[in-house]
């Protein structure tokens, strides 16, 4: 083997840090390194069922004294060990490699593969028989080192000759996917639960015999699409070295009598013969729906067969069933009991920390520019699941590629090395990608972060401040609220005359707090079918919880939740009000979800909705006073070609009783009058372009516009609103 070997040390295997994956690095407890005189950069052999070399690096201070060695899935697989197994290590002296020969595990032809593999392996120690995982265009290829010169542990250098054979290496291909625990981010707790349910029974059945209990037989993973349910099943199968049999619902189904059940029996038989095995049933709701709800005979028989196989008279041996679904309530309840699916584990939408971990995984092989801040990206991707974040990273990389495409000669045999070297993914690429990728949970309820800022709203300082405190602060500074042990308000009612800016305020608050925004119009929730309207309300709150932090905005809430028990009241609205009440203040907590409702008829809303714990903050949005009108004019005249005789103060004086929407209409009408004067009949486009340079909106245009656009609020209207507010405050003060 190598010339010189050190003494053997026994350590416990732990998973690698994300940034070390694929680098051939072993991070060791610093105390062990000091004790045995190991230096950073030394080369060691890791001895499990087989032997693999790695470069030593010290682990982080928190690992001191734990006696662990952190190695990635590739090294674990080469050494034939799993997490928490014991391995022996010893220091070796490696020679520089003159030549390394690799063969793929499946037929593949890589253009320029030798140069690519040399770049990847440079500086890494390798040994004959070692498998190397390589990412090419999003696919993982595995190569086996079939020979090295000299033999033993060698280090690949810039001068090493790499030979790539076209014929695949002769080795048994296991039915196990190439996914390791390091490929899963943001699911530490869930992964731990799944591992203790599955790894322990398969690796150490004697523990369960000693306790005199049956090991768990099945685990049901449920959660929204794209959160990583299938990925967890693949990683567990790979890490425990079990035979992996994936089943997708439709493959089982057959129209011929008895054939579907036969297929299921064959799968369980194959699993038993190749034990330890994991059977993975994806989308289990499609093959085991509730029997009372299906009309087809096949589904009922399949459910019955699955029940018998999972908890039948025959012992199943080392076979564990993992099932995944995003509709756990659609599964037959007989499956959801101990002895069949013993544990149900929710695989939820990742929080900010989880999103950062997932982004680290998907960008670990990406050449990122200095200005890319993954912390910031994690902040901006509320409601994104793992699959969305993967799509975001791919889109950003494609954007970077489009940027350099003009410099690349597509016809050339090889792209110049300097072009490849300078290819970097920047913050700008990620920002562009964010515009195109939205959370998948939200594609059906259009969620947008509106592009309205506080400065786009004239006046209303008091309302802005109240909204900031109630919505923006709890979402931006949750730690302060936790320290004070105060729960922020759940709901806010904006009320006031039409056109005063209630909807605009809701949009601005969603944008400024970086929250997702779901806008609900009353009529689209109402349905003539019994139970449908409530279901829509329930679904919407469920989605909002999923993509939290989120602002749900109900416009014209008086049409959706009128007073119950009134004359001519339909039962639909009564049921919708009840559903809204339970969602806002029910047993299930609304975390990071704020409800904002707007109305110009607060007296029509059901009083139960307006008590503390529901829509508890009532903010009156008054018609603008003179100061606010000046600000609104400034906002709407931004960038317009005004003549010198236009005086905004004077315009504000003349628009007493005008709402924000009326003032916008005045500015638009004045602009249209100026355009009408400019464009003459039969004018060509070129002439119009020339004339446009002289376009000015004058005082005369505004005077004309004011004659056309009348205020939508009369003095009586304003007085009526003010009286209404007094009554309203008296009721809810």
Curated annotation (Swiss-Prot):
The keyword ATP-binding applies. ATP binds at residues 223-230, 496-503. Keywords: ATP-binding, Nucleotide-binding, Repeat. InterPro entries: AAA+_ATPase, AAA_ATPase_CDC48, AAA_ATPase_domain, AAA_lid_3, Asp_de-COase-like_dom_sf, ATPase_AAA_core, ATPase_AAA_CS, Cdc48_dom2. It comes from the Archaea. CDD domains: RecA-like_CDC48_r1-like (cd19519), RecA-like_VCP_r2 (cd19529). Belongs to the AAA ATPase family. CDC48 subfamily. This is Cell division cycle protein 48 homolog AF_1297. It comes from Archaeoglobus fulgidus (strain ATCC 49558 / DSM 4304 / JCM 9628 / NBRC 100126 / VC-16).
